[in-house]
Structures are given as structure tokens and as C-alpha cells.
Amino acid sequence: MHVRGFGLSLVGLLLSLALLAGAATAQEFDTKAKFAVLMDYESGTLLFSKEPDTAMEPASMAKLMTVAVVFDELQRKKLSMDDEFFISEHAWKEGGASSGGSTMFAELNSKVKVSDLLRSVIVQSGNDAAIALAEGMAGSEPTFAGMMNQLATEIGMTGSNFVNSTGLPDPNQYSTARDLAVLARFLIAQFPEYYSIFAEPEFTWNKIRQENRNSLVEMGIGVDGLKTGHTEAAGYGTVVSTKAGGRRLIAVLHGMKSMSERAEEARKLVTWGTRGFELIPVYPDGKVVAFANVYGGKEPEVGLVGKGNIDLFVPKGATNCPTATVTYKGPLRPPVKAGQQVGQLNVFCNDVVVQVTPLYAATDVEQGDIVRQASDALKQLLLGWL
């Protein structure tokens, strides 16, 4: 699996959407969490952030990276839910009942199916299960951590480093609120066949029943995942996703003082995100949003369109909102193919980016004749590219 970013350079195409502006000030939000982000799932845009890129101890939320590696191996048929892994002495001592942490209570040298280990990690946050998966898949936790870091890099997590599968404290293990939101978005988008496990209310194994540690799943506010975490040093944290009104949000909060504060702050943030924004239809499917210059093309420019309708989520009652810029890496060079992603629409409210929508070439543009190429070359030489 290879996931690549799309580098863009700013171009001065400013779109005026002032007719949609409201008359009041956008609702402010604050949280007791030390670190927090609220991400729009569709666009990946942060609707709220507090220390989003500051390194923090991820605690058991690091298990989401473990789960991502397992999901990836399952999807690529390199691993089966029916495979069985041993519970090693390391898994038993570090993550078993005697460790005092979250555990599935697996016995030393027993064999457990991947399906049970995976559910234990997701629902119960079992440390022994996470270690057993890591050792069974990679031979050792350090080797598995290398797989975690490789995948993290591929999906665009730029501020994280993992050294174990459990999230147990280590000075060299860290992540950021933004990275954990990126990870949650990847899990939801890439693995729909497995994502429903996060919403399972409980898991029973070997006659031991344990409830989902993510209490928000049972709150009736649309939360269907993902993971909680806690250590004495880092405090209480959570990564949650909720879907309401046809829109999915991802929230990450960390550094709170108690389980009850964690649940309440997460509830407040996702509720604010659900109720504090409104949908504004802007461009129907196929409507040209802007034009991009094509250097040496048969046509001097190409129209940029979205895929489907472009609707904006903006804070209710915001002033100076929305305005937008179109950015693309240009000038483009032919041939340009219809449907090729070439830019993005960046929407601002009160000078804060609230939505990013990919834009695609509306038509093909072939290479122009020698006269067109010479003309564009002269223009670039004398004037720079406008």
C-alpha cells in the first residue's frame, strides 16, 4: 500500500462567496483537554484544534496503529482471522493479568485466534492481545513497531513514532492529536469491512465478558468508534468518530483528569461540531469552479470541477464567511487528462481553513502546436507565469 500526498503551490485565484456571509460571530468553543482536534471526515479539514501538532504520549490510543497494521495485512490476505498466535512470556508478563493493565486474561503459551486478539485490542484494549499480534506477525514487538512507523509515514502521520504495540509508556513513543485523527480517518476509509468492530458494545472470550472501554458508543450521539487511552503521566484521552445528519466527524482529545471528564469533553466537542455548522450548497456536479493555466497546451487553460456536488460546512452565523481560494501546482503541462486531480478548493471562515475539496480537470488538454509553445515560453521568460 502506498499513500502519497499532493503538493500544491498557491496561485492567486480568489473566489468571492460573500453573498453567503452571515451576520453574527461564529460560536467559540473551548475544552479542558490539553490537546484536541475536530476533523471533518470527508475533507480532512480541522474544524477545531488545540495544540494539534504538539507531541504527546498516545497511551492506548497507539493501539489504533497496531490495528491499522493488522487490518492492512488482513485486507492483503497475508493474515487470516482464523490464524492462531501464541501468548509468549513477554505478552503474558507485560500485558497479562499480573501487569495490572487492560488485558484479555490469556494464559501463558496458549494459542488464540487473530479474530479474538483483534477484538480484545479494539473493545477491551488488551495489552496481551496487542503483543501477541505483534509477535505473531513480525516475530517481535520492535520489528512490528517498524511496520507501524512505515504505515504511519505512508498515510501522512508526520509527528509520530511508535516503539511498541500497546501504547505503554516509553520516552521514544509519541504522537499528535492531528496524527491520531489522520489515522482514524484512514481506518474508517480504508477498512469498512472491519470498522464495525469498534462499535461492538462488549466482547466475551474464555467466559470473560468485558464492555467496550469507549463509553461514548453507548451515549446515543452517533459515536461508533474508536479508542480510549490513559496513563498516569498523560491523563485520559480518546479518539472518537460520530456520524449525524449525513456527516462524519472525528474528534481527538487528550490530557484530561478523569474518565468522566474525558467522556463529557468528547461529547461536548462532537455535539458542537454536529450542531455548530451548517451545510451550504455552492457548486452542482460538473460546474466549473475556476480555471488553471496550461503551459504549451492546445488550450490555454482548463476548467476545474469537483467530483459530485460541492457543499460547504461553515460555522453557523459566521462573519466574513465563507471565502475561498483555489490552489494548484502550476502552470500545468500537457497532456492534461479529464478527471486528473490538479488542485483544491480551500474554504475559509474568519481566516481559518474549514474545508478542503479536491478539484479535477474538466476536459482533456493536448499539447499545442509550436506557435503556442513558443508564445507560452516567451510569456514565461518576459513576465513570469500569471
Tell what function each PLM region has.
Residues 1-5:
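N-terminal secretory signal peptides that target proteins for export/translocation
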Residues 9-20:
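Bacterial N-terminal signal peptides
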Residues 24-178, 185-190, 206:
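Active-site-adjacent loops and short helices of periplasmic peptidoglycan-processing enzymes
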Residues 157-161, 169-386:
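Domain-terminus/edge residues, biased toward the C-terminal soluble/receptor-binding domains
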